[in-house]
């Protein structure tokens, strides 16, 4: 009876793995489409604004990331990747930065605790009125970044599923030395 349950679990893991592989193929195709669309929109913007108006000379001297990729690992599962805004605070960072007494009446000019620099939209590097194709390129690359994080999570889930599948096959071979 244990062999039959093990075979059923092996079948379900195999079906899950095939489903994940199919999803991975679809997401990779979507990522390729987003990146291709982004480069095409960027080329259209360069044509509309001129080659010298859209290039490395317009980049900010100090670039700040707008998003970060955060990896989180479950205790009993594979690692997952999420795209989050760079200025979003984690729960550990929320709250007062230091405990102190407040003065009710005192100097009116106080040091601001939350004076963090808000990341500027990179489209503003190229002027105030940018072509729509440049905005489309930014949106395509942003969507591509989310898809890349999804693909990385899916790939780790597939690798984790493959290792589980190998473990189940090994168990089955130990319990039932006949044809598997």
From Swiss-Prot:
Keyword Nuclease: no
Tissue: Predominantly expressed in the heart, liver, kidney and testis and at lower levels in the brain and lung. Undetectable in the spleen and muscles.
Keywords for the protein's UniProt record, in alphabetical order: Coiled coil, Cytoplasmic vesicle, Endoplasmic reticulum, Endosome, Lysosome
Record's GO cellular component terms: COPI-coated vesicle; endoplasmic reticulum; endoplasmic reticulum-Golgi intermediate compartment; endosome; lysosome; vacuolar proton-transporting V-type ATPase complex
Induction summary: Modestly up-regulated by FGF2.
Source superkingdom: Eukaryota
Signal peptide: none
Entry's transmembrane regions: none
GO biological process: cellular response to increased oxygen levels; intracellular iron ion homeostasis; lysosomal lumen acidification; lysosomal protein catabolic process; vacuolar proton-transporting V-type ATPase complex assembly
Localization: Endosome; Lysosome; Endoplasmic reticulum-Golgi intermediate compartment; Cytoplasmic vesicle, COPI-coated vesicle
Coiled coil: 4-38
UniProt-annotated stretches for the region Disordered: 90-113
Quaternary structure annotation from Swiss-Prot or TrEMBL: Accessory component of the multisubunit proton-transporting vacuolar (V)-ATPase protein pump.
Its job: Accessory component of the proton-transporting vacuolar (V)-ATPase protein pump involved in intracellular iron homeostasis. In aerobic conditions, required for intracellular iron homeostasis, thus triggering the activity of Fe(2+) prolyl hydroxylase (PHD) enzymes, and leading to HIF1A hydroxylation and subsequent proteasomal degradation. Necessary for endolysosomal acidification and lysosomal degradation. May be involved in Golgi homeostasis.
PANTHER family for this protein: COILED-COIL DOMAIN-CONTAINING PROTEIN 115
Name of protein: Vacuolar ATPase assembly protein VMA22
Native source organism of the sequence: Mus musculus (Mouse)
């Amino acid at each position: 009876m244990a062999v039959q349950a093990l075979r059923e679990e092996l079948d379900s893991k195999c079906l899950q793995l095939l489903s994940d592989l199919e999803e991975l193929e679809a997401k990779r195709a979507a990522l390729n489409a987003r990146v291709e669309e982004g480069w095409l929109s960027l080329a259209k913007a360069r044509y509309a604004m001129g080659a010298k108006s859209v290039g490395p000379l317009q980049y900010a001297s100090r670039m700040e990331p707008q998003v970060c990729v955060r990896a989180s690992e479950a205790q009993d599962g594979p690692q997952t990747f999420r795209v989050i805004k760079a200025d979003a605070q984690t729960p550990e960072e929320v709250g007062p930065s230091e405990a102190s007494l407040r003065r009710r009446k005192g100097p009116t000019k106080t040091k601001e605790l939350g004076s963090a620099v808000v990341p500027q939209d990179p489209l503003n590097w190229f002027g105030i009125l940018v072509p729509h194709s440049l905005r489309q390129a930014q949106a395509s690359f942003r969507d591509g970044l989310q898809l890349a994080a999804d693909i990385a999570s899916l790939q780790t889930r597939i690798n984790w599923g493959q290792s589980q599948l190998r473990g189940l096959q090994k168990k089955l071979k130990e319990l039932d030395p006949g044809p598997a």
